[in-house]
Design a protein with these regions (language model features):
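Acidic, glycine-rich low-complexity segments
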Residues: 21
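Structural detector of coil-to-beta-strand junctions
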Residues: 54, 76-78, 108-110, 131-133, ...
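Right-handed parallel beta-helix/beta-solenoid
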Residues: 1-6
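Metallocofactor- and cofactor-centric catalytic cores in central/energy metabolism, strongly enriched
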Residues: 18
């Protein structure tokens, strides 16, 4: 597709299809992506701006968003996953502009309302305040407990203020082999937060010039503490990764990359156009 109107039509249509996006398409409002869609950018410079990509109320969704440039949307979220399962967000470049007002943009990639089985891999997320929220409210535990199982791996979080991710209730959220750089935009900047008894495994990540790598036992803002296990991380000119308690085992097999090669792997391989 090469127009926003065609993109919206194809993304919202019923049935399985692969949608190839040519060029940067500018739109507005929300595109409600329907089930069984693979959305891929062509080359390194294709994508979407000005609109929210909504993936909601589908079990399973079976949605892939890959190799897209996605811009922050003033006053709105960029990608909103809500009450949906089986979604892969891979090799995208998600970026905004650093603004003085933290509410100028909403979330870049928010996962809420008991969404489940989500993988976020090999993305560049840059220049954003409210990066990625998992679980939207301290009061939503009855819906969220036992869900919000999300994996983040081989992403580059660059100049993000916070929420990379911020997790309530989800277990186990697996955050491994990501590179965090210059997460030090103000005195409250942090990378990861485990809250409201969430359970996170944080392993093999590189934190470079990060004000606070992780919050857990202390809670954050008005949210109660969560649990966090950290292992084999590298902290370079960064604040600590606070740990607390134990978490449930990861329910899949995987091989974590040695932390010594994570920065070079991620900076070379993450982002749109690098499939």
């Amino acid at each position: 597709v090469s127009t926003f109107a065609d993109f919206r039509t194809q993304a919202q249509a019923a049935g399985a299809r692969t949608i190839l996006v040519n060029d940067m398409l500018s739109g507005s409002g929300t595109v409600a992506i329907s089930a069984d869609k693979a959305i891929r950018g062509v080359g390194a410079n294709s994508g979407i701006s000005g609109t929210t990509l909504g993936i909601e109320d589908m079990h399973p969704a079976n949605v892939i968003i890959q190799s897209m440039n996605i811009r922050g949307v003033p006053g709105r979220g960029a990608i909103q996953i809500e009450s949906a399962t089986h979604i892969w967000i891979d090799h995208n470049t998600l970026s905004s502009t650093i603004e003085d007002n933290p509410d100028y943009y909403d979330g870049m990639l928010d996962i809420t309302h008991a969404a489940d089985y989500i993988t976020v891999s090999w993305n560049v997320i840059r220049n954003h305040w409210k990066t990625s929220l998992v679980g939207h409210s301290d009061g939503n535990g009855s819906e969220d407990r036992g869900h919000l199982r999300v994996t983040y791996h081989h992403n580059w979080f660059d100049h993000t203020f916070e929420r990379s991710p911020r997790v309530r209730f989800g277990e186990t959220v697996h955050v491994f082999n990501n590179y965090y750089s210059d997460v030090d935009n103000n005195a409250d900047s942090y990378a990861i937060a485990s809250l409201m008894n969430a359970g996170l495994l944080v392993e093999g990540n590189v934190f470079e010039r990060v004000r606070q790598a992780c919050w857990s036992a202390s809670g954050y803002a008005d949210s109660d503490p969560g649990r966090l296990v950290a292992r084999d991380n590298s902290l370079i000119s960064s604040g600590p990764c606070e740990v607390n308690g134990t978490v449930a085992p990861i329910p899949y097999t995987y091989t974590a990359e040695a932390v010594g090669t994570v920065k070079s792997s991620v900076t070379a391989g993450a982002g749109a156009g690098k499939l």
